[in-house]
Amino acid sequence: MSSRLNILLTFLALFFVILGACSSCAVFPRGPEPSPDLSKITFDLAPINDEGLAGPPDGLVAIDYELCIPATPQAQQEVNRMDPTVKFYPGSAGRIGCSKDQVLAIGNTHQKGWKIVLQQLTSLDYVKRIDRSFGE
């Protein structure tokens, strides 16, 4: 009798482990992924090459951009996961005009997949605009 009970308990334990592992499976669909909103980008991306550089052949430079995000660790972590080039400047409004409850974030295009990075950033609800940054 105890061996049957052990088998049953083992089966139930495995069932719940598998069920828990499948929480991200298609059986439990998540909400739709946010769509990128490229209208949030206020500068021309056309001159930027695949390496994220723009300018004459003998003077290529990365393009810096700035955005405002909520002044929370969660928002900073989310943005940093999307864009490893980003640096945060608490207390600075930047040219873009971040409010006191926001943090200025500055990144640049000189990274692999820079277009995808910008698209991901525009899909964040709290990102209202991405402007070119001139580092003044």
Regions found by a protein language model. Name each.
Residues 94-96, 132-136:
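Short linear loop/turn motifs
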Residues 72, 109-113:
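Helix N-cap motif at beta-to-alpha junctions
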Residues 93-108:
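Surface-exposed aromatic
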Residues 27-85:
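N-terminal secretory signal peptides
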Residues 2-12:
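Bacterial N-terminal signal peptides that target proteins for export
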Residues 121-131:
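Short acidic amphipathic segments
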Residues 22-25:
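N-terminal Sec signal peptide cleavage junction
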